[in-house]
Curated annotation (Swiss-Prot):
Name of the protein in its database record: Protein MgtC
Organism name: Salmonella paratyphi A (strain ATCC 9150 / SARB42)
Keyword annotations: Cell inner membrane, Cell membrane, Membrane, Transmembrane, Transmembrane helix, Virulence
Compartments where found: Cell inner membrane
UniProt membrane topology term: Multi-pass membrane protein
Transmembrane segments: 5-25, 39-59, 62-82, 103-123
Purpose of the protein: Virulence factor required for growth in low Mg(2+) medium and for intramacrophage survival. May be involved in regulating membrane potential by activating Na(+)/K(+)-ATPase.
GO cellular component, one term: plasma membrane
PANTHER family (alphabetical): PROTEIN MGTC
Similarity-based family: Belongs to the MgtC/SapB family.
Taxonomic superkingdom: Bacteria
Pfam families: MgtC (PF02308), MgtC_SapB_C (PF21770)
């Protein structure tokens, strides 16, 4: 009987971590994210397990284990971050997993009121701020905002190396950020299409004209295409 009484606080902490983690995960599951209900519940429960075990073995330093949990969640969060073209997806899901671990730590320490308050705030951030972010995205784009662009030039296969270096020099001169440079065979046999991924301010007309006019001076380039990256 005494052993059961000793186990009750342990089980209560784990159940609280699981339920609050599941509450956060339910919102992610509803939005069909990779880390949903079960993942967040397990992350919170696992964090609580580590905290409880550290309090059993070394009750004076649970903070040391909490720091290790934060590091461990970094590896788990990296698994849900995906790069699609120039866009990165999964950052919010990874951040939510990190928060779920924090909820688990609070539950493991028996701070249920703080854990519940944090859960409510996390849910508000994921639900209410999502709506706010969508409204902000509908506002006119600031001239200082960054946009992604795709620059494609076509050249003879033998001139590819020289044209690549030419492009690098022009991009550096235009003070625009180059995030990717590659090439593929062009539709016309014997030619290469060089693709540059650029990042610059939304007010890009002057930069575009500078780059295109400079590229046009190169006789080795047979075609130029510039567009905003829609991904």
């Amino acid at each position: 009987m005494e052993e059961r009484m000793l186990m009750f606080p342990y089980i209560l902490n784990l159940l609280a971590a699981m339920l609050l983690g599941a509450l956060i995960g339910a919102e992610r599951q509803w939005r069909q994210r990779m880390a949903g209900l079960r993942t967040n519940a397990l992350v919170a429960t696992g964090a609580a397990v580590f905290i409880l075990s550290s309090m059993t073995t070394s009750p004076d330093s649970p903070g040391r284990i909490a720091a290790q949990i934060v590091s461990g969640i970094g590896f788990l969060g990296a698994g849900v971050i995906m790069r699609e073209g120039m866009n990165v997806r999964g950052l919010n899901t990874a951040a939510t997993l990190w928060c779920s671990a924090g909820i688990g730590v609070l539950c493991g320490l028996g701070q249920f009121k703080n854990a519940l308050a944090a859960t409510i705030i996390i849910l508000c951030a994921n639900i209410l701020l999502r709506e706010a972010a969508q409204r902000i995205n509908q506002l006119p784009v600031s001239a200082e905002a960054e946009k992604r662009y795709i620059l494609k030039v076509t050249c003879n296969k033998e001139d590819e190396s020289a044209v690549r270096q030419w492009l690098l020099n022009i991009v550096k001169e235009a003070a625009i950020c180059l995030q990717g440079l590659g090439s593929v065979p062009a539709q016309e046999q014997g030619y290469k299409e060089i693709r540059a991924e650029l990042v610059g301010h939304a007010d890009y007309r002057k930069t575009r004209e500078l780059i295109i006019s400079r590229i046009g001076d190169n006789d080795n380039i047979t075609a130029i295409h510039w567009c905003i990256d829609s991904q």
